[in-house]
Amino acid sequence: MSTLLKFDNLSNTRDLGGMVSSDGRTIVPGKLIRSGQLYNLTESDIKRLSGLIDTVIDLRTEDERREKPDDVVPGTGYHFIPVVASFSEGVSRAVGSVENMVARLVFNPEGARNHLGSMYRKFVFSDYSLSQYGRFLRILLDDHDRAVLWHCSVGKDRAGTAAVIIEKILGIPDQAIIDDFLKTNDYLKEDLARMIAYAKSKTDSDDPLIEQSMRYLFGTDRSYIEAFFSAVNERFGTFDTFERAGLGLSDSDVERLREKYLR
């Protein structure tokens, strides 16, 4: 399981270090960190991050970045790699995207779950998204003195998928990947409560369907990661082929990632 790193104002921040691969090696601590957006951080947060990381990868859309730009962390490089474009409703936290999605799905839990599942499939079937995740992995292949941190808005879908991809490449067993993916529900309880309250306020309703829908839209569900893996198998046959044909990695790239991040 990844390790939660607690900050004043940085949600769902986790070090993948300590996760155990199928061959018994573990991911090196202090090298791979996922999080939510680096917006409105405290001075303490920034100081701590500057000692932990040397690279930030921002996976959000341009609209999200413009609405809530990352705070500058001294001593770090910044890479903007938006992994979704026009199909981002349900994944993006840009204001218009959230409002439209809530309006459509607030009383439809099954529709909400299916909507998010379809987003995870699009990560695989969109050549644009694949190329962007390939760029993410290229940065991980570079040499780094400290950790690489990648984030989206709350560290759930896009950052979560990036974590799933690198964990799978490093040989972490599927069940461990899924268990870690679902921990987001524990770490974003406050965020989810805010979204439920927002939806109830917008609809002026206390219908129990609202909470169910919001949990699917703003939490994680096993069906999402299963949809991702299913899409990989449908399009590429195996994850190995996905790594090569989808993400553009060579055999030597995969081996180098394992050498760099496992011990």
Where are these regions (language model features)?
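Cys-dependent protein tyrosine phosphatase-like superfamily
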Residues: 1-149, 162-263
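Ser/Thr-glycine-rich phosphate-binding loops at phosphate-binding pockets of nucleotides
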Residues: 154, 158-159
